[in-house]
Each structure stands twice: as C-alpha cells, then as structure tokens.
Curated annotation (Swiss-Prot):
Belongs to the CHS7 family. It is found in: Endoplasmic reticulum membrane. Chaperone required for the export of the chitin synthase CHS3 from the endoplasmic reticulum. Keywords: Cell wall biogenesis/degradation, Endoplasmic reticulum, Membrane, Protein transport, Transmembrane, Transmembrane helix, Transport. Interacts with CHS3. It comes from Cryptococcus neoformans var. neoformans serotype D (strain B-3501A). This is Chitin synthase export chaperone.
Amino acid sequence: MSDNAAFKFGSFDYICEHAALVVCPMLGDQQGMAPTCYSRNVQLGSQIIFQPATCILHIAALVMATIMLLHVRSKYTAVGRKEIVLFFYMYIWVELFAIFLDSAIIPTANKVYPWFAAIYAGSVGALYWCLLLNGFVGFQFHEDGTPMSLWFLRISSLVVGAVCFGIPVATFKGTSSSMSPTNTVGLFITYLVFPCVCVLIYFISQMLLVVRTLDDRWVIGDLVFMAGFYIAGVLLLVTFSVTICDAVKHYVDGVFFSTLAFLFAVMMVYKYWDSITKEDLEFSVGSKQAVWDVKDPLLATGMEYYEDDAQSAYRGAGGSLVGGYNGNQYYGNQPGYAQSAYGQQGYGQYGAGGGYGQGHY
C-alpha cells in the first residue's frame, strides 16, 4: 500500500489507510493493509485486545438491539413485525462477529481469520438486503407475516449472504486474476457499495410510503436522522478516522464513532417502524395483564372484591341491582349463593317465610 494513496473505485488502498476494516489484513501484499493511525490496545492477561472502546460499544449495541427486538416482538399485530424481527436478529449476529474480529480475539495471522472475515462480510451483505426488503413490506406486494413473505425474505437474504461470502473468500485466496488480494473490485462492490445502495433504496421507498399513504409527516424526521447518522458513520470511518485518532492521542479512532453512528441509524430504523405501526389491542396477546379485565364487585362470588367495593363512592352500599339491593346485599359477601337476598328478606310482601327456602330452591 502506497503512502497517501488517493481514493480509487475498486481499490481498498485509500480506505484501509484511513480505517481498520475487518477485511484489510487480508488485502494487499503478504503483510496486509493497516491504517496509519489506530486506537490503543489493552492487554488482559496474555490476550491483547484491539479496539477496546469499540468492543464496549459493540456490547452496548447488542444490549440496545435486544431491547428493541423485545419491543418489536411485543407488538403482536403490527404490520411487518416478523420481517423487522429478522433484521434485528441479523444485526445482533453481525455485532457478535464484530466483537471477535475488531478486537483481534481471533488473530489476523490465524488461518481461520479469513473465513471468519468472509462470514462477517457475507452477514453484512445479508443484513443490508434484509433492510432493503423491509422497506417494501409496507407496500403490501405480499401480505406481511405470511409464509411467502417470510421465506422469500429468508431465502433471498441467504442467497445474498452466500454471494457476499463467496467473493471475499475468492479474493482472500486469490482464486483467479480477477479476484485476488490486489484485485479487489468485486469485494469493493459487495462490501462497500452494495450496503450504501440498499440504504439509499430503503430511504427512498420509505419516503414514498410516507408521502403517498400516511397522514403523519413527523416520521420523515426519523428517516432523515437515520440517513444522517449513516452518512456520518461512513464519513467518520473513511475520511476523518486518522484526524480523530491523532486528535485524541490514539485512544479511539474513526471505527469507534462510525460504530456509534451506525447504532444510532439502526435505532432510527426501529423508531421509524414503531411510529408507523399501530397495535390492535383487541387482538393483542401481550405479556401485560389483560387490558379488558372487568373487576366488577357485583359479579363477585366472595370477599375478593369487597375492598374495591367499600372504597367506591357508594361505600359498598349503593348501586341497585335487583329490587334495590346492591352487590354486597345480593350475594351477602359470601362465596356462592348461600346468603342470597331472597332467602333473608323474601321477595316483596311475602316476608322471610315466603322466600325460597333460605337461599335454596
């Protein structure tokens, strides 16, 4: 890699000079490509941890993604719930891989590193493809949540992931003259260009969806913030990483801030989805207590609701049910009907003897 390399489409020279990407150690000459400035390492026992601040951020991203995933799963009747759930599962998968690769827990010199880096690259491609397809769920080309919708999303994401996995493997291994560590056009397209195209299509599709079908225009702000965070993450990673690294004396670099910006972008995706989907409470089966529970002391068969009745405006004495009796008098605050009002006072002018046998038929 030449010093002060200029940006060139299809080449990682400029990018790997400015940012410590997962694929960079496998590109270029036998020594790989390394950034001119990178964050400090820490040693835990015999293990050296690269990018420690970024690793902590990856863990925080896992926690936030889990929280968002649980919130999405709780909206049982929301449109596109199962599709967006798959997106968050894939994001969690990518973040798990990033922890082991960014930190060099799997050393770059290890013979398994190229395979893990290729799996990571394939997972990133599948993640962005899943986001792109989620952008079309709202147009209802197929009914969301159906086997057709879900299996198309899963199978197509698997196919895209396989392609984005195979190209890095071929590039790292140098299987042909068109794919080698020094000829990286294919990897450049699948690893860098393809994700940007997916985000662009998702943004445009959701803007069209909001403008054409929704009355609420405030959700456009979520989309704008999502796009802004994503663009900021790309620029911080590719353009300003070395500047940041030098300014803070190698404590962090652009990888840290780009990871943070991408996390914010994912949070905006969740915020946007949550804003445009409504929960149908009538058919919701959430983990909360039943929304439509009716705790009516008049229908109680024992002392269970007596306290609620006594604290009401009538102090347990008002509220006519039959013949001027309230719930406590009618049921006698006893289990069952053993002390019914008919048995105690009779019915009308017949008195106690004209009742129904002290509460029994």
